[in-house]
């Protein structure tokens, strides 16, 4: 699962190549987090996590500060979260998370992505049961058993630890995110985390047949072009991954 997870993240990152899209995504998320939970990252863990992620993805400081200042000013857009589920090209399971100020527009845009690439959008719960809400950490390392032992000694609830190709992937319940991150930083000072996030991890991977690869990549690109789409979770594994 670790290798497939890392490859899945890389495939998503390729479609998210445009810097303006990355900046917009973080700007919107930071604005909503600050508006709903307070402007101080020390007292708003969601905001702190987003700021840390933005810095890791090289989002300029002025983009972060502008989003927080916008939230402080009050008014502005009233975004709400929307989630859509269905089956993408080749039969893979897909969850699309959005932030929107117009549900009808967003629903139409996301539905078109499914329909124009041979997929099917479903009702809530269609595929959500095929994913688990987890905290995931990826970093350089070889000894996954030692990492598991150290985390257990730190009283962290661990779902799995995998080691492959010089990378360690740690999976925990999403509620253990900050506890696990704190423990990892204490166990391994100066640790550089390649990935640190709360996400939806598929229970079972789904191999995409070669004849469906082009449509799958088009599907992902179309979703990435939707301004309201923030995250896309899927269980697709492309050939040679």
Curated annotation (Swiss-Prot):
UniProt record, GO biological process: regulation of DNA-templated transcription
Chief location bin: cytoplasm
Transmembrane region(s): none
Pfam families per record: TACO1_YebC_N, Transcrip_reg
Compartments (UniProt record): Cytoplasm
Keywords: Cytoplasm, DNA-binding, Transcription, Transcription regulation
InterPro entries with a match to the protein in the record: Integrase-like_N (IPR017856), TACO1_YebC-like_2nd/3rd_dom (IPR048300), TACO1_YebC_N (IPR049083), Transcrip_reg_TACO1-like (IPR002876), Transcrip_reg_TACO1-like_dom3 (IPR026564), YebC-like (IPR029072)
GO CC annotation: cytosol
Molecular function terms, GO-annotated: DNA binding
Family: Belongs to the TACO1 family.
Protein known as: Probable transcriptional regulatory protein Ping_2063
Organism, as annotated: Psychromonas ingrahamii (strain DSM 17664 / CCUG 51855 / 37)
